Amino acid sequence: MFSIQQPLLVFSDLDGTLLDSHSYDWQPAAPWLSRLREANVPVILCSSKTSAEMLYLQKMLGLQGLPLIAENGAVIQLAEQWQEIDGFPRIISGISHGEISQVLNTLREKEHFKFTTFDDVDDATIAEWTGLSRSQAALTQLHEASVTLIWRDSDERMAQFTARLNELGLQFMQGARFWHVLDASAGKDQAANWIIATYQQLSGKRPTTLGLGDGPNDAPLLEVMDYAVIVKGLNREGVHLHDEDPARVWRTQREGPEGWREGLDHFFSAR
């Protein structure tokens, strides 16, 4: 059993979880965001998005100054008060976006895999794909340690592509709508564990953790949480955890921010 009282950390995915997958609306979650803010409970955003995108959204959601996890864990944006930590303001895991792009271009040219990366198109095209404004779409291209792409080949070729990436120390990860390539050592779980350890070091006590997500790439994050909310999502693969004890895992009936609210209601309102 746990409560909204400190120490508590809430880790949340964005698209399809805190934000509606299509409209990007988050208002159903607003009352809980306000309540958590008033209780001084950090809400740490975790996403495949770039840090530039997430800093914009963090401000919109009233969460500015808190740490966040970008690019599926390849980038950690540090909290404003963590200026003494090496690497401030961001810690980047593994190889850079530019190096990954070079690998992908080589694989495409020499082994003829079919895919389109965000680097291949302009912000107008990304805006069309995502429903974002052009200014917001431009932020999606500011990757530091990953590449986002649309797969345009067969499942058989995908298996071959994944194997080639693994040989090169990279991983191929499915998000809510797109695929992502990043260093094999990076992950939302690794980044979350680092943030949890930092809060523990600063406060002297390990915080209780609650995570919320809707896609396969959220599973590693939810596995390392004390409690998890699996928000009903659009992804056909869904989210499957090794430990789905009902005492610690809740699957919502609603999607997006309404599911986010449902998950918080389940774990806190009854306590």
From Swiss-Prot:
An individual GO BP term: mannosylglycerate biosynthetic process
Localisation: Cytoplasm
Xref: InterPro entries: HAD-like_sf, HAD-SF-IIB-MPGP, HAD-SF_hydro_IIB, HAD_sf, MPG_Pase
UniProt KW keywords: Cytoplasm, Hydrolase, Magnesium, Metal-binding
GO cellular component terms, semicolon-separated: cytosol
Predominant location: cytoplasm
Residue spans crossing the bilayer: none
Residues the record marks as active site: D13 (nucleophile)
Cofactor annotation: Mg(2+)
UniProt keyword annotation of Metal-binding present: yes
Residues at which Mg(2+) binds: D13, D15, D214
A Pfam family recorded for this sequence: Hydrolase_3
Keyword Transport appears in the UniProt entry: no
UniProt family annotation: Belongs to the HAD-like hydrolase superfamily. MPGP family.
Full protein name: Mannosyl-3-phosphoglycerate phosphatase
Lineage: Bacteria, Pseudomonadati, Pseudomonadota, Gammaproteobacteria, Enterobacterales
